[in-house]
Amino acid sequence: MSILTSPRGKVEVVHCRRTESQDIFCIKNLVRKFTQKLFGRLNIIYLLEKANLAVTVCNDKEEIMAHSIFLDYPNWNVAKQDNWIPLFRELDKEIPCTPLNTLFMHFFVAVDEYATGCLKEIIRTVFKAVPELYFIFLIVPTYLSLGSTLITVFDQVGNIPCLNYNEDFAVHICHRHNHYPQLHIRKARVEDHDDLMPIFMHYDNTLKEIYGEYFLAELIEAQDKDHHAVVCEVEGKAVGFMSVCTSVNLPLLHECFDLGPFHGFCTPHPDDILKPSREPSLEEGEEKHLKKCSTSLIIREMQIKTTLRFHLTPVRMAKIKNSETETSASCEEALPTVLGLVSEERLKQDMEKNLSILSLVDEEDVASSLSSSLLLSVESSHFRPLYLGDPIAFCIQLFCIDERYEARQVLISNVSLSLDFMSFVFSLFPGKNFCLISVPHLTPEFVLIQNFVKVVPFNNCTLDHDLYVFHRAGLLRSITIRLAKFLDTAGVEKLVSTLLLSTKILDDLAQYNEAGRDPDGTALQVFVAEVADQIVGIAVIRKEMDIEYIRSHYNIEDFIYFSHHQQEEHGRLNHFALNPIFRHYTKFFLKEILRLGYKSCLYYPVYPQTREGKLQSSYSHSLTSALHYLVPVRPRRQIVYPLEKLGINAPSKEVSKDQVSFALNHTNRKLTLEPKVTVNARIVVVGASSVGISFLETLVFCSHLKFNNLTLISTHGLPGKRLLHNEQRKFLASDHCFNDKDYALMSLCSWVNVVVGRMTAIDRAAKQVVVSKSEIVFYDHLILCTGLQYQVPCPTGADTEQHLTNREVLELSKQRYTGTVPSNLFILNDEEDCVRMLCWLRNSSILTEGKVIVYGNTLDAYTTVETLLNIGMKGSGIYFVHPPTESNITCINNNDVESAVEDALSAAGVTVFHDALLAQWNHGQHPDPIYNACFTTSTKPIRLECSAFFSFYKKNVDYETFKAFNDACLVYDGRLVIDTTFHTNDIAIRAAGSLTKFSNRYYSNEWTHSNFSSKEIGFQLAAAMLSLFDPTLEPVTEPPADLDRLIPMYKGAKIQGGILPGSYHYLHISKPAIPTPLNLQRSQPDFGSDVVTGNAKKGTYFRLYINNYKLVEAITCFSKEPFPSSNYIRLFGQHEQVLNNLCTRFDDKLIPDLYSYFTEPWCMALFHDRFIDLKKELRQILISKQEEDKPTMEEIAYRLEEEEINLNEKPQKYLQRVFEDSIYKSLLEKSILDYLHYNQYHLPMYAWPGII
């Protein structure tokens, strides 16, 4: 906030922010004729799309006071955007302008009264937002003066000609030091104490309480060769302090962090022990097989993830060689000794001697090492390398700076005469190459550490701090990005020699040098990063050929106005490799690629792994260290088109083609200077349920946040491995929250650490989760989303020889089975269980001659019976046993559908038993393996022979999970108890999903999260937590205690579906509700109407339930033919009139088949992902006041409802007539036509004015 005063004495409180699209209208109103003379006639929207930085000044009423746009190349076409540097260097050789430290002002407008103050505020904001920036150039025609405003900050440095026409332009410059304090770094003196103490006390008085009032003076006085205190001062006043020393607890760091990439912060020594001695016991026999299977089936997702994050974080920056000799040699080369003051020239000389200070890492090594370390069941002993060389690291003990000057603390980009902290402190320790700092996890990332590299901790790290490291060579600031040439080949080979796809990168480099394009004609560009005449980075981009597919399948328009970007301005990032020392230049590298390559957008796809466990598909995209500097783009929900029926009105093949799914990441010119808020809080999610996945998805796709410590603990890792080939035959029913394609489109493995194992304990005091009884995962926020699982059924033990009935037997469904678990008992809870069972079946003779029992009455039991029939099992070999139910509500809850399923089971020869309670296995003898099972019924007992037993009898909380809750003293009452904000009785532990129940104080035991959509629950859980991390959100205020009495009600549809016996495709969609028999619902006085077509037994059944508000509240589809489930899910909640007056047409017998009805061209817009946005826009028009003297349509409707208007006609007709005569009709029509026009690539079947 700043206060501006106009010449007339008016005062405005203003603040600066990034420009938003809704500012454009107000910005245009500020344009004057003089503005157009200075900057030309500009398309503001287009310019904003291509700007690197746009700043708007607002007052406290959010009225726009000023606006300015900055780009990284000159305006007025005085130079090409990729070659302006020589021209500006010639103007004044004393101005060392580079693409790194220079921006150009392309536009400025302001309210006249406050123009000068607003301009200075913008300039200060820009310098603060871009610490590397030192020069801002302004170019105007020579015949124009700058005016009274711009001349206050810009000075002329010369004239240059225009490329296009015969006219000269004046070049003006604005220097950082004129508008932002110049910091001077020096050794601290005792006299600085009085300046520094108020800064320390502003943040915390802990140090004063522990060490006394004069701790700072004592620290300054205690300086020696190993301890130094440094201050930065502005105008003679100390405003920042740093204490550094060589006392580093390296043994502790070795135990807690992976220091291998940095050679333990020691000089290489011949006796270093870098590899454990070979222990073949873990590599041979059964354990070798387990590791192989685990890698391919359980943690394959971690291989992509770890490699991506390794470069990014980066974790391993030096490839550990195979022998100690090689290691010593490589490390000697990798760690040069930089002596004396850190001058640019000296650093260049060191770089010329040996570039490989820290080399890139082979993705395969990374993936295999992390995969094995995270696979808890096969993790090797905690070997730590032994480094015998001299320590070459010092640490920052204490750091504090006045927040007004914090943004000035740049580590690598000072070209001013004074040196910043890092250059100065390295000069104090000429024999040290690494600077370390540890920061508590929950500390927001401050400017000082943004250019440090975060060191990855080991699994068993007990420190509650993150460790960051900065290498001396990172002070080099003369980095140049340019197009590659033939002479770069040797340098690139050295850079990428350890990368998995190094050959492909070198092939692309050779292809570019030879032809500049691929053999198929696709434009190809290769850029290199150069420091001290050495290649330190390479990027390969191609013209994006699938841009229409990307636009139609991903929400890329969340980040760009697509129509303002030309086809050739879209590029695909195929490879990106940068020496980790210069990781802080990644965004600059990307910005230069866009400038030099004449691109405005870059896309980077992450393909899912194949079943064989390859790191990437064969699409030749190497894993990139730039991933975390890109933003993940949400996939768009696609319409399933009836292509044959649409004919020539179907979308183009570019839109409708079925490609291999991939997750898309993106950057553009606007994002190159857009900061991300780093969140280091350790967020641990237990359970890969739909709730947990939805929670992680919501966090990952917050594009302005970067979560560094997301961890998922799951028995089988991330789902979505496509383990079952046939998508149409799943053993388990689906809740339609996520499928394999969704997982591929999200690529959570790129952002989430995955720990494969089972939670067995929670230590709330230490904030740690015990996994698989031995390993520890620390947390700051623990999210419990384990859900409910089918459990091993507990036989009642009833003696069937005594002919007991269910009434005479004690029901033990809630009792835990503690006996031997039979090897042929299958409890199917996820796809991994199904795969294991399927392998067992196919390796036995059961499919052809055995008998199986399917015990349960859930939808999963029905889909399993159908899948068994489908894979070749005879119906006569399947016993389908329904246990007694506690209510008269079935899992299908539709008599027509149930009757058709029963007939299909009978036709297939499946024997069905009802109300049968499991009594014994093997007559009460040893149960492994099961060869028969006895059941009691309401009449007489039954005994069934079997070769396998499938149990789907009642889901419950896993016992180990329950024990972890109970031992941790979390309140548990049949389910884990939570409040309305997902909190358990521990503020750091939240829970959600079917695992939970609301506290009894809400008096709502019948409502739990099980009644709602799991995907919506996960989203709401994430939304509740984001206020803790997202500075753009208002803090959530807790409601008064007496108001916290109502549970939240969510509106998302509850969905279940699958393939039922008889090969019937089944889908049921309903609103969240307490389950009630359908017949009872129909008997209620407020029941709406059913719209039903077809016959269940013929497989043509389609039911829509329209409530008394004429909204679709339930949908049931039951068909022999596959149908587009995702389309029908969009019908939920729609008004019947939106469905083309469905009820009227149905009553008039005009809709014989709803399946056919919803394949007609008119309804495609209903299935469009942006149809909901159109509805919101139309509603906003109706409730907004369009004419001063007339009420809105909403106000008229309210008056009718309150009977304030006397009518001689029906209210609906009156509303219709008023609407027809008002301006609202034309506004709505325009909005609808604009929607159809803008989305015509998805909806070409509709006519719009441009094609009429």
Swiss-Prot record:
Compartments (UniProt record): Cytoplasm, Cytoskeleton, Flagellum axoneme
Main location: cytoplasm
Pfam family, one: CFAP61_dimer
Top-level division of the source organism's lineage: Eukaryota
GO cellular component entries: axoneme; motile cilium; radial spoke; radial spoke stalk; sperm flagellum
GO terms classed as biological process: cilium movement; cilium organization; flagellated sperm motility; sperm flagellum assembly; spermatid nucleus elongation
The protein, known as: Cilia- and flagella-associated protein 61
